[in-house]
A protein has these predicted regions:
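Non-catalytic alpha-helical scaffolds and adjoining flexible linkers that form interface surfaces
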Residues: 1-251
């Protein structure tokens, strides 16, 4: 068996046999890894609580036939430590972990940008400088962008017409169409497209670009509308819902 080292975030764990667990990790160099931690469920396990979700760990592993084996684990930063006592932040963090796993469907395919986004998002949740819903939506939008699915917010997703003010009949990009890829002009607007408020679109752009001054000043109604659009857009492109999003408490 080949020995290798990596660091990453623990995404989830599941029981294996009477004393072991399968640990899913998003690694810096290895991408998403599924590895066995032997004896981790025993009271006197040498791993202790080092392999819990949200934890940034430094690992030594042996390659196995189907699952690798964790031989050593050291905590770099326990991002989950401040979260259980804060339900909105905890549920936002769980949604981040699930999303990161969905965006890395192929095992051992490098996904450094996704890992760095996840680390940044978990750090922001722990620091509590911004509302957890904003941190989550920023993470979701940027994850979509890394995967090549950034929504068009400043030009029509279909014809490319720019959002450069208003026409005689209103905004040039009055609608958001999930299947089209973002904002659309009146000519390209499909049936059933949403009509978000202008501040909602501005908030989405701020979260995507990292303009936290603008995002923090946003009103709750625009945050709620933004979250709904982001969730719908995410589900469309993943072709699968993020189950934990339904438990996120928006504030």
């Amino acid at each position: 068996m080949q020995l290798y080292r990596d660091d990453g975030i623990v995404l989830r764990t599941q029981k294996l046999g009477e004393a072991d667990r399968i640990i899913t990790i998003l690694g810096r160099t290895s991408g998403r890894i599924r590895a066995v931690a032997k004896g981790v469920r025993r009271t006197k396990s040498r791993f202790g609580a080092r392999l819990e979700p949200f934890t940034h760990v430094d690992l030594m592993l042996h390659t196995g036939r189907s699952l690798d084996i964790i031989t050593q684990a050291e905590v770099i930063r326990p991002y989950g430590q401040p979260l259980p006592g804060d339900y909105p932040r905890y549920t936002a963090g769980v949604a981040m972990l699930e999303t990161a796993e969905r965006f890395t469907p192929v095992e051992k395919e490098p996904a450094l940008r996704q890992l760095l986004l996840l680390i940044g998002g978990l750090r922001a949740l722990g620091d509590a400088e911004h509302a957890p819903g904003l941190v989550l939506d920023a993470f979701l939008l940027r994850s979509l962008a890394v995967a090549g699915y950034a929504p068009a917010l400043q030009e029509c997703a279909r014809c490319g017409a720019p959002e450069s003010g208003v026409t005689g009949s209103g905004r040039r990009l009055p609608a958001f169409a999930v299947a089209a890829g973002g904002m659309v002009c009146a000519s390209c607007r499909p049936p059933g497209a949403a009509s978000p408020a202008a501040p909602t679109v501005a908030l989405m752009l701020a979260l995507l670009s990292g303009d936290w001054d603008m995002a923090d000043r946003s009103e709750r109604r625009h945050r709620v509308e933004c979250s709904g659009l982001v969730a719908a857009y995410l589900q469309w492109h993943l072709e699968h819902s993020i189950r934990s999003l339904r438990h996120v408490e928006r504030v």
